[in-house]
């Protein structure tokens, strides 16, 4: 049949922040924050990045603070 998917186990994504023992997500650390932003400048969801809910909330706050302070763009430069 034409619309079937092949079965296979997906590898669980690892929380980058927890794996590297990062306790405080600083809004000034733009190199870290850029890992969690798409090419268009949007914050990537948990299902893509693999971060925990707690760390995703911290990331979102840090990214928004960084944008307001002018360290990161709101949209990508095309």
Curated annotation (Swiss-Prot):
Disulfide bonds: none
Organism, as annotated: Levilactobacillus brevis (strain ATCC 367 / BCRC 12310 / CIP 105137 / JCM 1170 / LMG 11437 / NCIMB 947 / NCTC 947) (Lactobacillus brevis)
GO molecular function: small ribosomal subunit rRNA binding; structural constituent of ribosome
Entry-linked PROSITE patterns: RIBOSOMAL_S18 (PS00057)
Similarity field: Belongs to the bacterial ribosomal protein bS18 family.
HAMAP family with a match to the protein in the record: Ribosomal_bS18
GO CC term, one of those recorded: cytosolic small ribosomal subunit
Name of the protein described by the UniProt record: Small ribosomal subunit protein bS18
Keyword line: Ribonucleoprotein, Ribosomal protein, RNA-binding, rRNA-binding
High-level lineage: Bacteria, Bacillati, Bacillota, Bacilli, Lactobacillales
UniProt keyword Aminoacyl-tRNA synthetase present: no
Residue ranges that the Swiss-Prot or TrEMBL entry lists as coiled coil: none
GO BP: any one term: translation
Protein purpose: Binds as a heterodimer with protein bS6 to the central domain of the 16S rRNA, where it helps stabilize the platform of the 30S subunit.
Assembly notes: Part of the 30S ribosomal subunit. Forms a tight heterodimer with protein bS6.
UniProt key word rRNA-binding: yes
């Amino acid at each position: 049949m034409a619309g079937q998917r092949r079965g296979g186990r997906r590898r669980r994504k690892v929380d980058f922040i927890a794996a590297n023992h990062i306790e405080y997500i600083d809004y000034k650390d733009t190199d870290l924050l850029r890992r969690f932003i798409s090419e268009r400048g949007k914050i990537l969801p948990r299902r893509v990045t693999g971060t925990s809910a707690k760390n995703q909330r911290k990331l979102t706050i840090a990214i928004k603070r960084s944008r307001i302070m002018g360290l990161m763009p709101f949209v990508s430069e095309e």
